[in-house]
A protein has these predicted regions:
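Residues immediately N-terminal to the Walker A/P-loop in ABC ATPase nucleotide-binding domains
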Residues: 131, 147
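Conserved beta-hairpin
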Residues: 40-42
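Residues that flank catalytic or metal-binding motifs in active/ligand-binding sites
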Residues: 81, 140, 150
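Flexible, glycine/small-residue-enriched loop-and-beta-strand segment within the central core
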Residues: 45-55, 60-130, 157, 165-166, ...
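Terminal amphipathic alpha-helical/low-complexity segments used for targeting or macromolecular assembly
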Residues: 1-31, 36-38, 76, 89-95, ...
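Conserved hydrophobic/aromatic beta-strand scaffold that supports enzyme active sites
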Residues: 127, 143-145, 153, 161
Length: 183
């Protein structure tokens, strides 16, 4: 009996959480600098600096995302759970005060750009100034501190190139068929 009740409560909790997330998502979409069509994300479980983020069409951001800074995300982009994107860092060379009290300034910020058709795996951290090229894949658990070439598969800490997603001929065919990315 207790098991049945526990399962029922778990189902009810999941249903309510998902329903609240959907309702809130539509309200929070207006807070982004701009957002394309068919954007899905979880406002209840994420921390996003909405006013500095630009989203393309068909973007999926899984639970527990932390996006901070000037971020431009293309179309057809998927983010796994627990992805962190940090567009800045803290000043640590001010000898007049502890790091705790030093406020972020513009010199410590750098825009992050993520191209079209990118897949970012779970638990990935992307640091300031990085540009991720079209068609790239970032393996789960990676820390991306340098730009990623188009159609590359990268992974590790720090992220390094593992493989190419396509051969040169496949890249050309892909590019000739990707005219709909801007729609």
């Amino acid at each position: 009996m207790i098991r049945i009740l526990a399962r029922g409560l778990a189902y009810l909790h999941n249903f309510c959480f998902r329903a609240c997330n959907r309702v809130l998502m539509y309200g929070y979409l207006q807070k982004f600098r701009s957002a394309g069509e068919h954007v899905l994300f979880s406002p209840l479980g994420s921390v996003l600096s909405y006013s500095t983020i630009t989203l393309g069409h068909h973007v999926f951001i899984a639970n527990r995302a932390w996006f901070s800074g000037e971020i431009e995300i293309g179309s057809y982009v998927m983010f796994g759970p627990n992805v962190t994107i940090l567009g800045g860092d803290h000043e640590f060379k001010d000898i007049t005060q502890p790091m705790f009290f030093v406020k972020d300034n513009q010199q410590r910020q750098a825009k992050i750009k993520i191209g079209n058709d990118v897949w970012v795996g779970a638990n990935v951290t992307i640091l300031k100034g990085v540009e991720i090229g079209q068609g790239a894949i970032i393996a789960a658990g990676s820390v991306v501190n340098k730009s990623v070439e188009p159609f590359s598969i990268v992974g590790g800490v720090p992220a390094k190139k593992i493989a190419e997603r396509f051969t040169q001929a496949e890249k050309q065919a892909y590019i000739s068929h990707s005219h709909h990315w801007s729609k």
